[in-house]
Amino acid sequence: PYTTLFRSVTSADSASTLQAWDAIVELTGANGVRRVPIQKFYIKAGQVDIKPDEIQTAILIPKESYENCFGNYFKYAMRNAMDIATTGCSVNVRLSADKKTMERVRIGFGVAGPVPMRAVKAEAGAAGKPVTMAAVEEIAASVLEDINPRDSWRASKALRQHIAVELTKRCLMKSIELAGGVL
């Protein structure tokens, strides 16, 4: 993912998943090793926090982001010949021991703003919600408060918003299923 990750390409498939899994980018340069949380790595469209003498030496996933966590990624592309995501969504979920409550939800997006991003308001609202279809639909609808997709020749803002809600719903449903929850 070097070219898409380091050019701050919002449509990069890996970028939304790295957001949802709280990745840390490890950079090594003349001054040693530096670790940057993925949420701070993307500065603006086309710009990331890497110094001219640095190279990426690792992408780290914190234990709390994978232990007892399950995730899924869906991408919507307009056609197979142009595999660039119109919108991409990745969800990482941790359920309670009885599988009836969402303890932690992380939602990452590509092409929902100028840089890959998290739906932090939706995530905060998801914590403690019951594992129900109504809760999934509520969380999915709430991502509209976090994202800011643009109009482009590939898709309108309205279409991207619609897709983001639907992809969140599908990713959350699949992640809950993978975690052992029943909707």
PLM regions and their residue ranges:
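C-terminal structural segment of proteins
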Residues: P1-L183
